[in-house]
């Protein structure tokens, strides 16, 4: 099973728009990431997002390319300050490839728990629009891919 963790793309500041939709740069970055994932033949059964507009827009841009059979869905457990425990349970029970689109510090905390890293300093960074992919091998999770807008030309 592969799990793709995606931090939402760059968004407008709350001063510009309280809903904080993706900025033009954020949309471009995520569109480029989605195309790269499509070119790599990445397959996910479904994409879950936090429900915040920037997260939903990111999820939908990626889904437009990857076409997950299970669609795109909001889940209440991917917010910036949410407890990772319910999502850890969900991920551990999942058998199909899954993508989660969320925020910091949630994604970094989830990644740290999955790979059992003692310190987040040893893990890939979650800049806006970045993806970190992990794969379950036996009973352990390992990072196998890290992509972001600055890494994709």
Feature locations, PLM:
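Generic beta-sheet signal
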Residues: 3, 96-102
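Active-site nucleotide-sugar/metal-binding loop of Leloir-type enzymes
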Residues: 90
């Amino acid at each position: 099973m592969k799990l793709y963790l995606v931090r939402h793309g760059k968004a407008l500041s709350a001063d510009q728009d309280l809903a904080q939709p993706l900025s033009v740069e954020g949309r471009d970055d995520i569109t480029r990431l989605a195309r790269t994932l499509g070119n790599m033949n990445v397959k996910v059964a479904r994409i879950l997002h936090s429900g915040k507009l920037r997260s939903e827009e990111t999820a939908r841009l990626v889904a437009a390319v990857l076409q997950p059979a299970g669609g795109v869905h909001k889940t209440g457990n991917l917010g910036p300050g949410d407890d990772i425990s319910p999502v850890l349970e969900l991920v551990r029970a999942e058998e199909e490839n899954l993508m989660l689109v969320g925020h910091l510090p949630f994604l970094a905390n989830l990644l740290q728990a999955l790979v059992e890293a003692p310190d987040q300093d040893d893990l890939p960074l979650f800049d806006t629009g970045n993806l970190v992919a992990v794969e379950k091998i036996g009973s352990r999770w390992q990072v196998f891919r890290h992509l972001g807008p600055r890494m994709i030309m």
